[in-house]
Amino acid sequence: VCREVWKREKGLSYTGQTVQVPLPAGQGTGMGKPLKLINHPVRADIPVWWASLKDLSVEATAELADGWLPVFFMPDKFEQVWGAALKKGSAKRSPSLKPLEISAGGLLAIDESLVGEAKDKVLDMARPNVALYVGGMGARGKNFYNDICREYGYEHEAAEIQDLYLSGKKDEAARAVPREM
């Protein structure tokens, strides 16, 4: 839908499972008609990037988006979590789209003094945020970030972090985040 709007070729009409443009008669003001974007985009090809987590949304990302913003991305393990969904979506990808780009963020610390155990000082800054997502973003059994950590092979650690976090022990949950995670 966004790409059609940005093209500005004609007024937008779209009927999908969840979106209808313009609204059908009897909804909204009842004056709905296909409209064309008034503004002229600075560039014709505006990249669409999705931050998706679970199989169906990752599959749709690989099929439709220009780029993917995964969370907790581990280059040596990501295929065991998202590989099948990425392959399935890529197989349906339009040849008119460029290959899917992946941008996995992370923390960066540049300091020559951070060697050996001193590296943990940097990791300690990240641990509370990881604990929040793995332990506190969702109910027990319905936390997508916790699920990802389990799929990476950190079942015990993810359960412990969540147990601590949900029982109000946020600092302990942060300390339970292992260095490898």
How does the language model describe each region?
Residues 1-39, 80-81, 88-181:
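An alpha-helical appendage that flanks or caps ligand/catalytic pockets
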Residues 39-40, 60:
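Divalent-metal (Mg2+/Mn2+/Ca2+)-assisted nucleotide/phosphate chemistry catalytic cores
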Residues 41-47:
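A local structural motif
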Residues 48-51, 68-70, 102-106:
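Hydrophobic faces of well-ordered beta-strands that scaffold small-molecule active sites
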Residues 51-60, 126:
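Short, acidic/polar
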Residues 60-69:
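Glycine-enriched alpha-helix->loop->beta-strand junction motifs that scaffold or abut catalytic
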Residues 66, 85-87:
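Short, solvent-exposed amphipathic alpha-helical segments in soluble enzyme
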Residues 73-77:
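Short, acidic/turn-prone active-site loops that include or flank metal/cofactor-
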